[in-house]
């Protein structure tokens, strides 16, 4: 089935004659196909568009959600804007505050994916996620930086190597400040 690795083992099944009145013979066989899974990795940088070198961003946090488990996807309120599959822009204004994070499985037990926090090199890697489409949201934004838009990760292959790097740029906040100096006597 889709989303599973192919078990190439050849299994021997014995079917014996059970009489002329038996129209159907059933044999049970367990096949050990595994769900495809793969991690993804990212790196966070910060630049203002003026510099040639970028700063690595430590302490940025990301939460991972399985798209098919999101409330508005399940109840049909949110549909893919392109009519086929969800894109990052579909989740730009989505409220994730009441949603459950995605799960991965350890020995058959569902384990919530923890918040991914970038290290001092701006690097974070997810656990191996089961086959499916996920939306990743920046949940912790370091001080004085802008939060990046959500992005979509599609797990389609079975690999122990994380998906290639995704580089995200947290630009510093820019603002204008106007100072008006007033004289105490003239106002």
Place the predicted regions along the sequence by residue.
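Solvent-exposed loop/turn and edge beta-strand elements of beta-rich ligand-binding domains
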Residues: 1-187
């Amino acid at each position: 089935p889709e989303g599973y690795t192919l078990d190439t083992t050849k299994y021997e099944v014995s079917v014996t004659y059970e009489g002329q009145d038996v129209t159907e013979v059933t044999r049970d066989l367990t096949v050990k196909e595994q769900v495809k899974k793969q991690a993804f990795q990212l790196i966070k940088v910060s630049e203002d568009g003026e510099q040639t070198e970028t700063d690595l961003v430590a302490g940025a946090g990301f939460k991972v959600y399985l798209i098919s488990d999101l409330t508005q996807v399940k109840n049909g309120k949110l549909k893919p804007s392109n009519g086929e599959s969800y894109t990052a822009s579909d989740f730009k204004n989505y409220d994730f505050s009441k949603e459950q994070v995605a799960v991965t499985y350890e020995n058959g037990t569902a384990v919530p994916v923890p918040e991914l926090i970038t290290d001092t090199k701006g690097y974070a890697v997810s656990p191996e996620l089961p086959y499916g489409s996920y939306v990743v949201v920046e949940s912790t934004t370091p001080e004085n930086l802008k939060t990046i838009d959500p992005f979509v990760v599609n797990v389609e292959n079975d690999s122990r190597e994380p998906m290639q790097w995704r580089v995200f740029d947290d630009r510093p906040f820019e603002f204008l400040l106007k100072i008006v100096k007033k004289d105490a006597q003239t106002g």
